[in-house]
Structures are given as structure tokens and as C-alpha cells.
Amino acid sequence: MIQARNKLSQEELSEAKKLINCCQAYDGTYRDPYLSNMLNFNPDMPAFFLYYEKGELVGLLTVYADDQDVEVAILVHPNHRRQGIARALYRSFEKETASYPIESVTF
């Protein structure tokens, strides 16, 4: 199940950080996605898409949008990859943000 948010609750933030740490340790990466919407051109636009499976956060899409050229980061738990989660998150992002003036998306 995917949930779209314009802000993360403290619990969601904690879950997101745990998922990010897990993915970074597995992938050997260090870049943290932006976990706030403070700089987004529209603070009401969904900036976080959370994919839950059996109550566990296993996928996360974040949106950094300080202008109409937005940056997206997608993380999926290593044990849940190759199951279409990233694709589902991106499609949800496209649907939920279709009415906002986004000109381009980079990863």
C-alpha cells in the first residue's frame, strides 16, 4: 500500500531513516535523500511516497522540488527489490503530482 504525504510524521521519519540506512549499507552508498518539504515550491504537494507491506516500510520515494525541475530519490529494501515497488512508487508520484507545474524530473 502506498501513502502519499507532504510531510512525514516523527514515526514515518524514523522508519524512513531506518530504510535509508539499510539501503545505503547494502548498496555501499552515502547520499541521503532530502526528508523535508521546507524548500519545495509548493508545500502542499506530496513529497513523500511510502510503500508499506505487512505494516513495514519497504519502499520510499522522496521529492526535492525547490523549483519546477524536481529531483526524485527512490529506495527499496534489498529484500523487496525486483518486485515492481519502485515502479509503483513512481507511478503514484506521477498521478499525485500531475496537477502541479513540474517541468522535469531527475534522479
Residue ranges and their predicted role:
Residues R82-E96:
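Conserved acetyl-CoA-binding loop-helix of GNAT-fold acetyltransferases
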Residues A73-Q83:
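A short, internal acetyl-CoA/4′-phosphopantetheine-binding micro-motif in the GNAT/acyltransferase core
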Residues L39-D44:
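Short loop/turn motifs at secondary-structure junctions and domain boundaries
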Residues M1-L35:
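Short amphipathic alpha-helix that is part of the acyltransferase structural core
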Residues M45-P46, E71:
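Short coil/loop residues immediately preceding or within conserved phosphate-binding loops
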